[in-house]
Amino acid sequence: MKIRLDKSLPGGEIAVPSSKSYTIRGLIAAAQANGQSRIISPLAADDTLASRQVLSGLGIDINTDAEAESWQLTGNTFKKPAGNLFCRESAATLRFMSAVCARLPFECRLLAGHSLMRRPMLPLIQALHQLGIEIETRGNTTVIKGGEITRSKVSLPGNISSQYVSALMLMAPACKSGLEIHLATPPASLPYLKMTKQTLESFGIKAYTSIDWQEISIPPQPYLPARYRVEGDWSSASSFLALGAIAAPLFISNLDTESFQADRIMIKFLSEMGAEVESGQNWVKVSPKPLTAIQADLTHSIDLLPALAITAACAKGQSILSGVRQARIKESNRIRAVSQGLSAMGINVTEEDDRLIIEGGMPRGAEIDSLGDHRIAMAFGALGAVTGETCISEAECVSKTYPDFWQKLESLGGKVIKDV
């Protein structure tokens, strides 16, 4: 689907959807608990539904209670799958479930979608090999021959993706001797590991970490069933937070300002750039003011790159966004996608290995190729609503994490014309 955005000044009030990361973590923890758990306010989007579908294929009974806005699971009823398990384009699903399947006493075959095939799995595969697991990738299929895991020590790099580490943390309680995880390099996206630990604790799991998080110890122990409430998603909110800074005042609810989520730092960045930011219990309000350039380290909040970049494009001066190297291995090469998109809109951008340098100016409308990347589509959707005369290809890709993004933008006064 291709959409066109005509010029507008969107503003008003919205509630952002629930967190993708917490929904997937909660599902996988609940699936390993004996008894019934309830996931309250889960996100129903492509990535989370991929996790749900894979768990269902493994024998986990998951029911939707529409009235209570929750999913109810009966855990630890794993059985050999009848066929392949499709992870769609969800890297978290593929990586987390590869680890979970590794401790099940049968073979599992996880299928990756087209763009997911390009995202690296090797560090996790090597870590599972250290634990004696037979796992290999054949084209778009990851084949895991699982069984009881008796080894208890594993080492892997921490600076490529926190998802490899979270995957091991989620499987660790079911290992015969637990796991001692050593990170050979400091962890990137550390807040995501804290989110995993928080989820484990919600299901009765005790996990121990060193101060620098390069040593993680999780003893063998049972997951306990739980009522698990999913908070709002700061990553999905980021494009609307940016919109509030460049367009008109925007009140956003369902955001916990005390969250472990890395991307809540977006409001700190916007405040430093000059936007007016107010917050309270479960809400944030952002209002536009003259913006100045920023130097921001995104090492632990890499998903903010597109939203912060479109804000920097509207700010006075040269912004430097650093710590962005790993953005090249997301759903698209986001450094290249952001650079090409802003360049098409008349903004000078310089790509470096680990930095993006943006000369603020007056962006104009342009043809934007989202490359099927939901965060690129949402960020340029926000900017395009302000500039007008902007078309975005593969706009339906927002269904990965925010299925009604375009409807929300319209509800704020954005002029969105679909199927152009």
Curated annotation (Swiss-Prot):
A GO molecular-function descriptor: 3-phosphoshikimate 1-carboxyvinyltransferase activity
Binding-site residues, 3-phosphoshikimate: 20-21, 25, 161-163, 189, 303, 326, 330
GO biological process: amino acid biosynthetic process; aromatic amino acid family biosynthetic process; chorismate biosynthetic process
GO cellular component terms attached to this protein's record: cytoplasm
Pfam families: EPSP_synthase
Active-site residues annotated for this sequence: 303 (proton acceptor)
Localization of this protein: Cytoplasm
Reaction catalyzed: 3-phosphoshikimate + phosphoenolpyruvate = 5-O-(1-carboxyvinyl)-3-phosphoshikimate + phosphate
EC number: 2.5.1.19
The UniProt record lists the keyword Transferase: yes
Residues that hold phosphoenolpyruvate according to the record: 20, 119, 163, 334, 375, 400
Enzyme class: transferase
Ranges in a coiled coil: none
UniProt pathway annotation: Metabolic intermediate biosynthesis; chorismate biosynthesis; chorismate from D-erythrose 4-phosphate and phosphoenolpyruvate: step 6/7
InterPro entries: Enolpyruvate_Tfrase_dom (IPR001986), Enolpyruvate_Tfrase_sf (IPR036968), EPSP_synthase (IPR006264), EPSP_synthase_CS (IPR023193), RNA3'P_cycl/enolpyr_Trfase_a/b (IPR013792)
Key words of the record: Amino-acid biosynthesis, Aromatic amino acid biosynthesis, Cytoplasm, Transferase
UniProt similarity note: Belongs to the EPSP synthase family.
Stored PANTHER family: AROM/DEHYDROQUINATE SYNTHASE, PENTAFUNCTIONAL AROM POLYPEPTIDE
Description of how the protein assembles with itself and partners: Monomer.
Function: Catalyzes the transfer of the enolpyruvyl moiety of phosphoenolpyruvate (PEP) to the 5-hydroxyl of shikimate-3-phosphate (S3P) to produce enolpyruvyl shikimate-3-phosphate and inorganic phosphate.
NCBIfam families hit by this protein: aroA (TIGR01356)
Name of this chain's protein: 3-phosphoshikimate 1-carboxyvinyltransferase
Gene name of this polypeptide: aroA
